[in-house]
């Protein structure tokens, strides 16, 4: 995240870490904010004519939701009037270049949703809240596709289990 702080990409990346999809981020405006509450009710999508338009719902009607975002992020959206105004594909291109420059394993912008689900789970947030914030309607999808383990958290869990298994 430090690499995008202060850039035009910061808001979009941070919202990605809140579990938002790229199209949802690109459709967000300050009108979607009520203090720290961000309503996710639309998405920027490409049409069959290869034009980008705002669709009046996110990926699914079950994806409509309101999430709480931090003060600084809310203030940025309020000040700028939007979350990301440029072409949605630029988020993917920027991330690809950033990952390559940093020499870290490649990942997609959409993978930030998995980061959100995994981090929230590792913090002990119940699945019902993770699902509500990420716009998932099925624990099956959440568990099968999005939740992953973090090596440090897994190591902590293994040490805890090991301590209980000692004679």
Each language-model region and where it sits:
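Active-site-proximal segment of tyrosine recombinases
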Residues: 24-26, 107-108, 117, 124-136
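Short, polar N-cap/turn motifs at the start of nucleic acid-interacting alpha helices
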Residues: 32-39, 126-145
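Short, basic, alpha-helical segments at the C-terminal edge of helix-turn-helix-like DNA-binding modules
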Residues: 158-166
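Conserved tyrosine-mediated DNA breakage-rejoining catalytic core shared by Y-recombinases
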Residues: 2, 27-76
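Active-site/catalytic core of tyrosine-dependent DNA strand-transfer enzymes
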Residues: 43, 65-105, 116
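Catalytic-site neighborhood detector that most strongly recognizes the C-terminal catalytic loop/helix
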Residues: 44, 134-159
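Exposed loop/turn and edge beta-strand positions of beta-sandwich/beta-sheet ligand-binding modules
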Residues: 9, 63, 103, 111
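Basic, Lys/Arg- and aromatic-enriched nucleic-acid-binding interface segment
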Residues: 1-26, 113
């Amino acid at each position: 995240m430090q690499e995008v702080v202060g850039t035009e990409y910061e808001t979009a990346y941070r919202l990605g870490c809140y579990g938002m999809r790229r199209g949802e981020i690109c459709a967000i405006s300050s009108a979607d904010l009520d203090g720290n509450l961000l309503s996710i009710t639309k998405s920027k999508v490409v049409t069959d004519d290869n034009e980008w338009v705002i669709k009046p719902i996110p990926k699914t009607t079950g994806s409509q939701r309101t999430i709480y975002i931090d003060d600084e992020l809310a203030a940025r959206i309020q000040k700028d009037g939007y979350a990301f105004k440029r072409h949605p594909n630029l988020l993917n291109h920027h991330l690809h270049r950033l990952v390559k420059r940093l020499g870290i394993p490649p990942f997609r912008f959409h993978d930030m949703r998995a980061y959100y689900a995994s981090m929230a789970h590792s913090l002990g947030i119940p699945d019902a809240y993770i699902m509500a914030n990420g716009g998932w309607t099925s624990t099956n999808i959440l568990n099968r596709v999005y939740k992953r383990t973090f090596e440090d958290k897994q190591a902590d869990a293994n040490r805890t289990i090991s301590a209980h298994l000692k004679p």
